[in-house]
């Protein structure tokens, strides 16, 4: 069924499944396994690589100028989207929802948000005081008013 959709290879699949012997033993069974999606390879890995393999070609086909995504400040999805866009030569705008009250500078400048910036994504922070859906709508309206992502 997936064959009818255009797809680009962004990850290393299938990812391994590993038996967690110690946890299985500790629990006295049943056998516990883990799917190692950290091994997908795209921007330190993650399960969102699979959907991006379909979404990015669709964006290219539709001549999308800027891929826009929304997530929390340390969003894995946002990081992987930024990486996929960079690989495919697309601009990426990430709207990050500030969920913490008075987060430390390290939180706002390290981890995934640091990687988002490294991948060249434009970052907009939705303040805690604003509704993220309304904030996103305003950003999208602004893009459209500039003739972007019609």
Residue ranges, per PLM feature:
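PLP-dependent amino-acid enzyme catalytic core
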Residues: 1-150
């Amino acid at each position: 069924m997936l064959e009818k959709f255009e797809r680009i290879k962004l990850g290393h699949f299938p990812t391994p499944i590993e038996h967690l012997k110690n946890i299985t033993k500790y629990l006295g069974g049943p056998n516990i396994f883990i799917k190692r999606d950290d091994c997908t390879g795209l921007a330190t890995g993650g399960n969102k690589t699979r959907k991006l393999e379909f979404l990015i070609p669709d964006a290219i086909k539709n001549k999308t100028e800027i891929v826009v995504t929304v997530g929390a400040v340390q969003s894995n999805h946002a990081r992987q989207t930024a990486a996929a866009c960079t690989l495919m030569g697309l601009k990426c705008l990430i709207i990050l929802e500030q969920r913490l009250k008075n987060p430390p500078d390290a939180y706002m400048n390290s981890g995934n948000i640091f990687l988002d910036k490294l991948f060249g994504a434009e970052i907009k922070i939705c303040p805690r005081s604003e509704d993220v859906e309304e904030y996103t709508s305003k950003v999208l309206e602004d893009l459209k008013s500039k003739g972007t992502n019609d």
